[in-house]
Amino acid sequence: MHVPVLLEEAADALNIRADGIYVDATFGRGGHSRLILSRLGESGRLIAFDKDPAAISAARSIRDERFQAVHGSYAQIRTALESLSVSRIDGILLDLGVSSIQLDEASRGFSFRHDGPLDMRMDSSRGKTAAEWLATVTETELKEVIRTYGEERYAGQIAGAIVMAQTRQPIVTTFQLAEIVAAVVRKFGHRDGRQHPATRTFQAIRIHLNQELEELSVTLPQCVELLNANGRLVVISFHSLEDRIVKRFMRMQAGTDTLPRKLPVRDEESRMHSRQTLQIIGKKIRPGENEVAANPRARSAVMRVAEKLETGSKVDR
């Protein structure tokens, strides 16, 4: 069962208007969507996105004229909304990462805790599986992926072990990969007992395969463009790589962060960063002790909120 993280907090952060138009960019199993719908009036509207065909299938169970589900990535949100004749929205929620159901379903291949085919695709209807990618990736590229997206100190040793194992037998299951990685980590160092040795490597491969950080980076500017004045951007992230992108973007748009000196930027980027388009609302929010006790996977969640300003104002540098 998928338990939505920061459920009430996210809905509160959207500051929902009864007649507003809202987007749940990651439907999952609809926990956030259902609460948003409960707070909308008869003329309100909610549009949900998800790359996962199983999530879209679950969305069909919502029989509500105010609700519409779109199978696709939130990276194409502007184009998708245009096709629905929606040019502006009053709020958008991005609940990033992989869902509990995806982790717990062995056939999806996301988790080292359940043996299954090494898949890891958010959209199981397209693209390479993790097994297919591992069969062709070079040791150098694999090391870079694990180091960059997993922040794994033993990236080089793990990449070498995976490539070596691949020459002996194709790596096609989650347990195969987990055992290879765990053996390396246990050999070269110690890891927090609460975290499985393969956690960072699985995260890295999943992020790379699904282009999660690239999609987030191209989505955030679209969100700002689509928001009406006083509309809210609410983002829940689950690891430092995501949160760093969200934090930096919001600070840039709020005029509280500057471009690094000597960084080459296009004129349009310089103009964008010189105008204040967002106001950051409050501090980052984390799940409380009770929520973490009931749902341990919520422990790493961080929610950030920003509001679209009436007009972009000049920021003095």
UniProtKB/Swiss-Prot annotation:
Q: EC top class, in one word?
A: transferase
Q: Quote the cellular component terms of the Gene Ontology held in the record.
A: cytoplasm
Name the positions where S-adenosyl-L-methionine binds.
30-32, 50, 74, 95, 102
Q: What is the protein's given name?
A: Ribosomal RNA small subunit methyltransferase H
Q: Which family does it belong to?
A: Belongs to the methyltransferase superfamily. RsmH family.
Recorded name of the encoding gene: rsmH
Q: Which InterPro entries match?
A: RsmH, SAM-dep_MeTrfase_MraW_recog, SAM-dependent_MTases_sf
> E.C. number, please?
2.1.1.199
Gene3D superfamilies, A to Z: Putative methyltransferase TM0872, insert domain, Vaccinia Virus protein VP39
Q: Which cysteines are joined by disulfide bonds?
A: none
Q: According to its UniProt record, where is this protein mainly located?
A: cytoplasm
Question: Function, please?
Answer: Specifically methylates the N4 position of cytidine in position 1402 (C1402) of 16S rRNA.
Q: Please give the catalytic activity noted in the UniProt record.
A: cytidine(1402) in 16S rRNA + S-adenosyl-L-methionine = N(4)-methylcytidine(1402) in 16S rRNA + S-adenosyl-L-homocysteine + H(+)
Q: Which UniProt keywords apply?
A: Cytoplasm, Methyltransferase, rRNA processing, S-adenosyl-L-methionine, Transferase
The biological process GO terms on file are: rRNA base methylation
Report the subcellular localization: Cytoplasm
Point out the signal peptide segment.
none
| Species per Swiss-Prot/TrEMBL record | Nitrosomonas europaea (strain ATCC 19718 / CIP 103999 / KCTC 2705 / NBRC 14298)
Coiled coil region boundaries? none
Query: Is Ribonucleoprotein a UniProt keyword of this protein?
Result: no
A single Pfam family, by name?
Answer: Methyltransf_5
In alphabetical order, the GO MF annotations are:
rRNA (cytosine-N4-)-methyltransferase activity
- Record's superkingdom? Bacteria
